[in-house]
Amino acid sequence: EGNALFLEALGRYLEAWLAELDLALAEKRVALNEAQLAAAKAQEAQGQATFKDVLEAESALAEAKASLFAAQNARALASARLERILGRAVAPKALPLPQDPPSLEEALAALENRPDVALARLRLEEAEAALAQASRDRALPQGSFSLSLAQGGLDLSLSLDLGAGALGYALGYTALGAAEGTSLRAGASLPLFAPVQEANQKVLENRVAQAKLALEAALKDGELDLRQKHQARLLAEAQLAAAETSLKAAEASLETAKKRLQAGTGTRLEVLQAEVGLLQAQRTLEQAKANLLQAHYALMDAMGIDLLGGER
């Protein structure tokens, strides 16, 4: 299905984009831990730190390098997955956020557009049509019409079954004693007791009942799915707003650290720490955007919208 392919490709793209950010954050953390280790060694030489402080800084640096190695592998794996699904290498970037999200009322109004609901309704219509046809066939009388003509030993007869719509004929020849004349016969029958037709009627009635239950279930499940996905989108929007606030705070912290460094009241280490905090806030923001994108398109899919722009 096109929508499933779109959602999978979107997930792989966002995975690769976030892996790029994770790598940049891991590199910055290594730089920070290297600076912290250098500071610890300098403080130890001045008697302001202990050897234990140096060991802890070395351990933190080793962990940061291990995280960097893991981030490099994760980025390579995410890039390979993205290339496999797209068929070519792509450098991921931030995607624009969707505009004009649907309201809950608009989402629920699209319930009939869902493929599962449409399929359940189609099956009900087919079952009802089959039952109606069987009821008509059982109620219609079975009629027949026949015409026979004998002339000079030649016998010709025609018959018409009105119920089946079948026309038959017969041609015969009698050498001796042939009677001449014409006869016309017509008849009709109304089935009062037809066990086979009644059994078939029951089967079709059961199919209609089952189809109605299936449609009701599809409508209930579809409404619940739409409500859940709409709620998930609202939650993603709230998380995005919180991430934007955190980013502003991180930007302010970095600006303060830079001003303190210029004024001689701060250190380069404080600036590095603020830069790491800013990268972390940016990573959190991009994760929130990715969650919003996936929640939005999952809602569009639940509404029965073709994400590739065609017709479902």
Predicted regions and their residues:
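Periplasmic alpha-helical coiled-coil/stalk elements that build and connect Gram-negative outer-membrane
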Residues: 4-118, 123, 229-232, 236-240, ...
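A small-residue-enriched
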Residues: 7, 88, 109-199, 224
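A glycine-biased, small/acidic residue-tolerant capping/turn segment at secondary-structure junctions
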Residues: 251-271, 306-309
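Sec/SRP-type N-terminal targeting helices
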Residues: 2-4, 27, 52, 56, ...
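Active/binding-pocket-proximal capping segment
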Residues: 151, 205-210, 246-257, 277
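Gram-negative outer-membrane assembly/targeting C-terminal domains
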Residues: 295-312
